[in-house]
Each structure stands twice: as C-alpha cells, then as structure tokens.
Amino acid sequence: MANIGQFKVGTEWKKLDEVTGVTFEADSSYTIQNKEYQALLVCEGAEAPTDRNVGFILQTGEAFGYTAKSGEYLWVRAYQNVAQFNIAEGI
C-alpha cells in the first residue's frame, strides 16, 4: 500500500517511524495525511504490553488504521466507524 507519509503530533510533523513511544491522549486531534483525526480512546495491551492503541475517526465516518507490527497502512471502516491505530514501542 502507499505510504501515508507524515502526521502531526502537536505542532510538529513526524514520520510514523519517528513516533515510537508517543502517548496519544483521548479527546486530542492528530493530522494524518492532511486529514484531521480525533483520538477517541487510549488503551494499552490489545496486541502486546508495549502497544498503544488509539481509535481515530473523521466526522464523515472514515476511519484510519496503522498496524505497527506488520508496518502496513490500512484504510478501514471498522465497527461503529472506529479504527485502531497501533504504535508498538521498541521496534
């Protein structure tokens, strides 16, 4: 799949491989591929104890997902339009 490129953490643009270990906050927005996403939730341990799992959603219902373990970018429309954005630490 095509590389999604950079996204914004706070006021800084970062590449996905530069944000390992970033703690996303619920009710905060992040810009991915020039689109604004809202972080719906933050929970740990869905796939591994070091994963950060964040749901992102657009007002249009479009959801975005990134799987850190496989390094693939996925456009998904998940249950209730919530996707998981997983960033594994230490990879």
Which residues fall in each region the model found?
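A short "linker-to-beta-strand initiation" element
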Residues: 1-9
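Edge beta-strands of jelly-roll/beta-sandwich modules across compartments, strongly enriched
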Residues: 40-44, 80-90
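Short, surface-exposed beta-strand/strand-loop-strand elements in extracellular ectodomains
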Residues: 33-52
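Intrinsically disordered, low-complexity Pro/Gly/Ser/Thr-rich segments with frequent PxxP/GP/PP motifs
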Residues: 51-71
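Noncatalytic modules at the cell exterior or secretory-pathway interfaces
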Residues: 28-30, 67-82
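Surface-exposed ligand/attachment interfaces on beta-rich extracellular proteins
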Residues: 8-27
